[in-house]
């Protein structure tokens, strides 16, 4: 076991026991990609030769390529428990429990966080759908449920509201950074951030540095529509687009159960693409990525860039 402690904005975050993890080869850039056709259907059967990778406009040689069903999956589920979600939480519990039961395999892990006025870890890494379901049972409006082992992930914000950006940052930096395989953050929220100390770009940067993909489930109670200012839809879209994820919208014709089924299908239809950058300078700078499919009718969904972290 190892202890992980991070300091954010002058606030010392609580150290927690973490599972020992393997380190990734820092010279290899790994990209998760999904491919869709013009009808938005997933394309799961492409080969390495069907892809082109550009870094800052320069072609790169793909060294590693695999279907994502072969790699372990680490999921962080973040559930909005602010007042605007009060009438949706029971539905979220049931749908998320079913999702974990269907998507997790023996080598996969997941953790569960809630966020409202603060962020809280309800269930640490586990491969047990039963433990995750128990954690879902502890969801409570406005800040989650207290006293759940191993305790709260300290929030950055002390203001009242919905600390969406802070929660994503904490999930990426405290939980996912350093893990191997596929790393996914699934956020269930109406997208309206209120009270975070960090901004949207900082949340995106944290996810990119952790090689994590953000999938946003836009779930809004119609009774609260417009009550908290502008829609959070643009924020959800930006965070998902920049990290290679997708926004799923729950509405009368598209249930949360259906959304989780589509998300599961996408996770099982991904490609992992790896290359060694021709630019060997590790200056901490941002490198733009452009992943293309040979078939012009296909659209590749992948992160827009990465940070060349200094050794």
Where do the protein language model's features map onto the residues?
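Sec-dependent N-terminal signal peptides
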Residues: 3-14
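Compositionally biased, low-complexity segments enriched in small residues
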Residues: 1-4, 19
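Scaffold/interface architecture of coatomer-like assemblies
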Residues: 15-311
């Amino acid at each position: 076991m190892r202890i992980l402690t991070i300091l954010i904005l002058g606030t010392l975050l609580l150290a927690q026991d973490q599972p020992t993890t393997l380190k990734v080869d820092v010279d290899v850039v790994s990209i998760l990609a999904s491919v869709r056709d013009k009808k938005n259907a997933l394309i799961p059967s492409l080969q390495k030769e069907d892809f082109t990778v550009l870094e800052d406009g320069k072609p790169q040689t793909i060294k590693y390529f695999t279907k994502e069903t072969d790699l372990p999956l680490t999921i962080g589920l973040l559930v909005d428990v602010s007042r605007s979600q009060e009438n949706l939480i029971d539905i979220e519990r049931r749908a998320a429990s079913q999702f974990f039961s269907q998507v997790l395999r023996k080598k996969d892990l997941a953790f569960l966080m809630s966020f409202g006025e603060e962020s809280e870890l309800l269930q640490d890494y586990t491969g047990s759908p039963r433990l995750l379901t128990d954690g879902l049972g502890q969801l409570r409006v406005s800040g989650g449920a207290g006293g759940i082992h191993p305790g709260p992930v300290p929030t950055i914000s002390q203001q009242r509201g919905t600390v969406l950006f802070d929660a994503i940052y904490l999930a990426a930096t405290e939980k996912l950074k350093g893990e191997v395989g596929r790393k996914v953050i699934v956020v269930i929220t109406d997208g309206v951030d209120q009270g975070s100390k960090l901004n949207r770009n900082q949340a995106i940067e944290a996810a990119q540095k952790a090689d994590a993909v953000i999938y946003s489930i836009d779930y809004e109670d119609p009774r609260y529509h417009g009550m908290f200012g502008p829609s959070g839809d643009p924020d959800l879209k930006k965070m998902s687009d920049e990290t290679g994820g997708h926004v799923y919208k729950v509405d009368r014709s598209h249930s949360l159960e259906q959304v989780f089924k589509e998300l599961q299908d996408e996770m099982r239809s991904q490609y992992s693409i790896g290359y060694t950058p021709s630019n060997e300078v590790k200056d901490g700078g941002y490198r733009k990525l452009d992943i293309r499919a040979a078939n012009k009718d296909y659209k590749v969904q992948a992160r827009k860039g990465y940070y060349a972290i200094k050794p």
